[in-house]
Amino acid sequence: HLEHRRQRQMCIRDRDMHAYHGKDERRIPPLILGHEVSGQIINGKLKDQISVLNPLITCRNCEYCKSGREHLCPDRVLLGMNRPYERQGAFAELITVPDHNIFKVPEKLDVKEAAVAEPTAVSYHAVLLAVEASKKPLNECRTLVQGGGAIGLLCALILSKIQGNTNLTISDPNQKRLNACSKYVDAKTVSPDHKDIKESSFDLVFDTVGLEVSRQQAISVVKPGGIIAVSYTHLR
C-alpha cells in the first residue's frame, strides 16, 4: 500500500452532502468522507508525483475482477464509506491505497482539474455503454440529458466535444444549474416539463438524476428501440 499525502484538491459531491445530512445509509458517522481527490504521493513507485486515485478498492482475484467488472466485486471497498466495510475517506490528512489504484497526472493537466477524474470516468463510461448499444452514431442521435449536476454536465460535455452530438438537450428544474451548463456546453437547456420533451422523441436519454420520476420520464420520451443510459441512483 502507498501513502497519499494531504490532498491538494478535493471534490465535494452530492453523496458527501447526503452523508453529512444523515441521508446515506452507507456512510454513517463517525466517518471521514471523500473519494474524489488529487494529490502528491509520499512513498512508493510514484513518490512525489501528482496523482489521482481510483477510490474503489477490490480483491482483484474474484470472477468479477478478473473479467474487468471490478465494481461487482463482493469484497469491494470505497473510500469514505462504511457499508459493507469501513474505509476512511480522502478528507483525512493521510490515506493509504494499493499502488494499482494510483495514476500519475499528465503534466499538462492542472491538479484542480485532476480531482474531477472520478466523476468524469463515471460519465465517460455511461457514454461508452450508449455507443456500444446504439444502432446509430451518437452524433446523429437526438439526445436528452436529465439533470444538470456534475454527472449530467460531464455527460453532455463528452457527448458534445468527443462524440460530436449537436442535437443535445439538458433538462433540470434548477435554472442556476442550467445557466452553468450553458457556459460550458452547446446544448438546449430546459425544465423537465418543457413542451419539447415529448413522448417517443429522443433516440438517447441519459438519466443522471436517479429518481422514480426521472426514470419514468426517460421511458416515456425515448423512441422505440432507443437507449436509456442510467448513470445515477438516488439514495433515500
Question: How should these model regions be labeled?
Answer:
Residues H1-R8, I12, H234:
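Single conserved hydrophobic/aromatic residue that forms the stacking wall/gate
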Residues R5-Q9, D24-K66, P106-K108:
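Glycine-rich beta-strand-centered segment in the early N-terminal region that forms part
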Residues D14-Q40, V52-N54, C73-Q88:
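N-terminal glycine-rich cofactor-binding segment
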Residues N54, L94, A115, L144-G148, ...:
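Glycine- and other small-residue-rich loops at beta-strand/loop junctions that grip anionic moieties
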Residues N61-Q146:
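NAD(P)H dinucleotide-binding glycine-rich loop of Rossmann-like/cofactor-binding domains
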Residues L109-D193:
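Mid-domain Rossmann-like dinucleotide-binding core that forms the NAD(H)/NADP(H) cofactor-binding site
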Residues A133-L144, I162-Q163, L178-N179, K183-R236:
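Glycine-rich cofactor phosphate-binding loops and adjacent beta1-alpha1 units
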